Amino acid sequence: MYKSIAIMIILLPLASALINGLFVRRIDKKLASIVATSFLSLSALFALIIFYHTGLNGHIIHIKLLPWIEVSQFKVDWSIYIDQLTSIMFIAVTWVSSVVHIYSLGYMSRDKGIVRFLSFLSLFTFFMLMLVSADNFLQLFFGWEGVGICSYLLIGFWYSKESANKAAIKAFIANRVGDFAFILGVITIIFYCHSANYEDVFLLAPKLANTKILLADFEISILDIACLLLFIGCMGKSAQIGLHVWLPDAMEGPTPVSALIHAATMVTAGVFLVARCSYLFEYSPMVLQFITIIGGITCLFAASIAIMQNDIKKIIAYSTCSQLGYMFMACGVSAYNSGIFHLVTHAFFKALLFLSAGSVIHAVHEQDIFKMGELRNKMPITYGNFLIGSLALIGIYPLAGFYSKDSILEAAYSSGSFMFIFGILAAILTAIYSMKIIMLVFHGKTRLEKDVFEHAHEPPKVMNNPLTLLVAGSFFSGMIGYYLLSMDKPNGYFHDSLLNLHAYKLLITHPPLHIKLLPMVVGIIGIVVGIYLYKSDVVMSFLRRQESSKDNYFTKILINKYYFDELYNFLIVKPINCLACLFYSGDQKIIDRFGPNGFARSVNCFSRLTGKTQTGYVFNYTLYVVLFVVVTISYFVWLVAV
C-alpha cells in the first residue's frame, strides 16, 4: 500500500500537468482549477502518510519501477527511494505547492493563460519530487534539468514582455554554467565508480578519497574533484555568490512562481543534493571548507544588497539567497541536519512572505515599496501574515526560524568557523530589511495615488485562506522539528539519512547561553534599528538622499548589487559579442563571398554570357558552326604536325 501511495505522490502532479497541458485548448478554467488543486492536495495528503510511515517509523521505501540503462556492467533503474530526508522534502514540496496552486486561482484569475500556468506549476512540482526521490545520479539529473526547464517556462510565462523573456534566458544560461560542472561531476563519479547508484557510490567514497591524481603539480583526490564539481552545480541552482545573478531577474514571473521557486523547489535542490551526498562530502574536508566560506559570504552579501532594494519581490528574493547561504554554511560544517531543518521551516515562511507580497501587488498594482504605505488598515490579514513571516525569517521566538537558524549558527560556532560572525551580521541585516518592508508598506503615510489607496482591499478568500497553512507552518514547523523530531541534532531525525563523521563534536560541544540567544538578540536590535530608520520622515528623507547621492560610493555599490551584472557584461558578454561579430564578418565576407554565394555568382555570370550567344538569328548560328569546324580542323592539323 505504501509503495502505491509513494508512486501516487509523484504521478499526481504529472497527471495534472499532462491533463491541463495537453487539453489546454479544450479544457476550461474551472475544470483545470479543479484538476490542479485536487491532484496536488491529494499528493500533499499522501505525503503525510509517507512521512508517518518512513519519517516517523523509519521504514525506508525503495521501489524499482523499470530498467532504464544497461550497458555491459553499467546498470541504472528508474526507481523511487524514500528515506527520512526524502519524506520531509515531500512534505515541504507538496504542501507549499498545493497552497501556491490554490492561491494562483485568485491571483491569475483574469489571465488568459491560467490553464497553461497551472500545467507548468504541476510539472515543476513533479520534477522536484522526482529529484528528491531518485536513487541514482542520472535520475536526479533528470529532475535537476526538469526544474531548470520549468523555471525558464514560468519566469518567462508572460512572454509578450521583453523583460520576462530576457530574465528567463538569463536564468537558463546562468544555470547552464553550474549544470555543466554538475554533469562533469556525475561523469567523474560514474567513470571511477562504474555506477550511478547512490548506494554503490557512497560505499566507494573512502576509496575515492584515497585515489590521488596530479593536477597542475598539485595532488588532489578524485573525490575532491567530484564534490567540487557537484557543488558548483549547486551554486548555480541555489543562487550562491557568483552564480546568483539570475535570482532577482526571476521576479519577472508571476508572484506564485516566485513563491514556488524560492520556497520549496528549484533553489532548494542544491542544498538537498549536498545533504543527500553527505556520504561523499564528509570525506572531502577541503570542499566542505569551501562550501562553508561560500555559504557564509553569500548570506551576508545577499542581505546587504536586500537593504538597498526598493522592489518588494526583489528584497524577498535576496532574502532567499541569504537564507540559502545559511543552509550551505550548515552543510559546510557538517551540520546537514540543521541545513535541511532550516530548508523546511524556510519553505513555509518564505512562501508566506512571497504570497503576502503578491496580495499587496494584486491590490495596489505596484512593487516599489517607497510608493506604498498605510496599508495595515486596508489589508489587516495580509499585514498579519507578512508580520508573522517576517518575524519567522528574523528568528524571533517561538516562530520556526528561531529554532532552525539558531541551530545553524550554534553548529558554526561549535565548529570554530569564522563564518559564524558573517551569520550574525546577516541576521542583523535580515531584521532591518524585513522591517523596511513592513514600515514602508503597511505603516506611515500612504504614497499611493488617492484612487488606488481608496480601492485597496484584501484579496479574495481563495488567495487568503490557503495562507493559513503557511502561517501554521511558520509557527509550528520549528517546534515540531526541534522538540519532537530533534532535527537540530545529528543523531536525531536524520541519523539514518545523513552522514556526519564529526557528529560527536557537535554532541559534546554545548555553546554558552549567550551564544544561543545571540541570534535572537541581534534580530531584536535589527528590528529596533529598522523601525527607527524607516518610521521617521527626517531619517527617511536622509536615507533617500544617500541612496540618490552620486558621491556615496558604498550605497552605489549596494544599489548596483556589487556590479556583478556589469562585471559579467564586461568580461563575458561583450567579448563574446565581439567574437560573434568577428565570426559573422568572416562568415559573410569570406565564407559566403567565396563559397556558396561566390559559386552562385559565377554560375549566374556564366549563364548570362552564354545567354548572349542565343540571338535567334540563323547567320549567327552558322558562324558558330563554321568557327567550331575551323578550330577543330586546326587542332587536329596541329596534332599531326607535332
UniProtKB/Swiss-Prot annotation:
One of its GO terms (biological process) is ATP synthesis coupled electron transport. It catalyses: a quinone + NADH + 5 H(+)(in) = a quinol + NAD(+) + 4 H(+)(out). InterPro entries: NADHpl_OxRdtase_5_subgr (IPR018393), ND/Mrp_TM (IPR001750), NU5C-like (IPR003945), Proton_antipo_N (IPR001516). GO terms for molecular function: NADH dehydrogenase (ubiquinone) activity; quinone binding. It is a multi-pass membrane protein. GO terms for cellular component: plasma membrane. It is found in: Cell membrane. It holds the Pfam family Proton_antipo_N. It comes from the Bacteria. Its EC number is 7.1.1.-. Belongs to the complex I subunit 5 family. This is NADH-quinone oxidoreductase subunit L.
